[in-house]
Amino acid sequence: MPVIKVRENEPFDVALRRFKRSCEKAGILSEVRRREHYEKPTAERKRKKAAAVKRHMKKLSRDNARRVKLY
């Protein structure tokens, strides 16, 4: 769990914002949402494979767009 130290004369809102940012960087909320319900191993593999395919297609489209602009 992210820990922040409240600085002297620091407003509560600023400290809360820093805490939220550190939680977001650590990925706590996404982890909680992911673990909210049990996911079968086959469903997890399927989800991860779909994400990998999506990342690959996105990378390919970015590379193709770059090539078009260079010529």
From Swiss-Prot:
Alphabetical list of Pfam families matching this protein: Ribosomal_S21
Keyword NADP: no
Keyword Lipid metabolism part of the UniProt annotation: no
One GO location term (cellular component): ribonucleoprotein complex
Biased composition annotated in UniProt, kind: Basic residues: 45-59
One BP annotation, GO: translation
Molecular function terms, GO-annotated: structural constituent of ribosome
PROSITE patterns the UniProt entry points to: RIBOSOMAL_S21 (PS01181)
The protein's name in its UniProt record: Small ribosomal subunit protein bS21
Species: Pseudoalteromonas translucida (strain TAC 125)
Gene from which this protein is expressed: rpsU
